[in-house]
Amino acid sequence: MPDRTTGFRFQDTFLAIEDPNIVPSDRMPGILRKCMSTITNGSNGTNGGGYLEFERPLAKIEKQIEELESTQAVTGRDLSEMIRTVRSELLTAKRKLYADLNAWETVQVARHPRRPLTPDYLGMMVRDFCELHGDRNFRDDRAIITGFGRIGPHKCMFIGHNKGKDTKERLENCFGMAHPEGYRKALAKMKLAEKFGVPVVCLIDTAGAYPGIGAEERGIAYAIAVNLMEMARLKVPVVCVVIGEGGSGGALGIGVGDRVAMFEHAYYSVISPEGCAAILWKSAEHAQTAAKALKFTSKELRKLNLIDDVIKEPLGGAHRDPAAAAASLEKYIVESLRDLKRVKPETLLKRRYKRLRELGSFFTVEGAAAAKISATKPRTRAAIKRAPKVIVAPATARPVAIEA
């Protein structure tokens, strides 16, 4: 169906790939235009070796290794010692680089075109996977994949975003941006899991929910809100892991659980850095500044107690060794389910509710700030006192009470 604001059809995107002149770029919705640019221009700024912009020094060292190996093969000279030395340099440089990635570099790794997706992880760590389709209401949203399977000794319901591997699949799946039907599909499968007493495992990897008019007309915000409410009271263990991008309500729609974890180089944010920059600075060029301000990396979110655990990735990111990343993810899920299945459903619900109520920290200050708070309405003072976590800041802090 055509987009009601632009007259754009998804079929047009296939034509644009073959010949961009057939479908003018100004007829494409902005978010699809960006995705199309990713497909046609060598996704996410990577070169032929899959290196990102900030990884260029590593690419140079790897090229040296390739040249030495080629010279050794052609001339027959023994260059093994030199190759070992350069490989050691590559390993050291990689460790140093990935020990302290900034927020924007983390976003680039999370979006790497070779990064494993939900179907990849399901294929590597889940046995007897049986996919389930449809929301029993309107249609089957391919941006969300659901199904029963076994992981370790546990039978589970698996739910996750599916961005797609090739161009055709990415377009069919809207690059992992789910419509309302996707979230209703996920909820229907969660309720099915609850009926059979089976734990739910959610793998989050989306830039956000689909932002089209059709999705709004069919109640995308309502669908996500209902999922938040229903996931909070599911009577089975729920484990959620951000495996790549965790964008806004699109991620939250399957992100309420007893355990919430992130891969080391994933990000989890209220908005994409480009979206934030467009709002605050009226230009996506400030995306790096926005990324730093949003505090959405795994380390920062763990410090804020917004997530429970950080899952280590192979050196260089999950795309460098998908099997090792899958092994780490499988271990975390199996151990989490082992612990959660020992807890009675009533206790599980109380803990989950308590966990949700304690999200966020409230900062208070003394002196002039205390006087300012005292001058507020009684209801406001009571709300401040009921804050789940109170951090007393130094007297030199700004004289305001804010929610972080």
Q: Across the structure, where does each feature detected by a protein language model lie?
A:
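Intrinsic-disorder-associated, low-complexity terminal segments enriched in Asp/Asn/His/Tyr and depleted
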Residues: D3, D12, D19-N21, D26
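Aromatic (phenylalanine/tyrosine) cluster motif
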Residues: F8-F10, F14
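Intrinsically disordered, low-complexity segments enriched in small/flexible residues
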Residues: I31-K155, A323-A404
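Terminal peptide-recognition signature
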Residues: I61, N102, F158, D205, ...
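Glycine-rich beta-alpha loop segments
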Residues: A99, D128, F138-D140, T146, ...
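Short active-site-adjacent helix-start/loop capping segments
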Residues: P116-T118, D166-K168, Y210-G212
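Conserved catalytic cores of soluble enzyme domains
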Residues: I204-V334, R338, R342
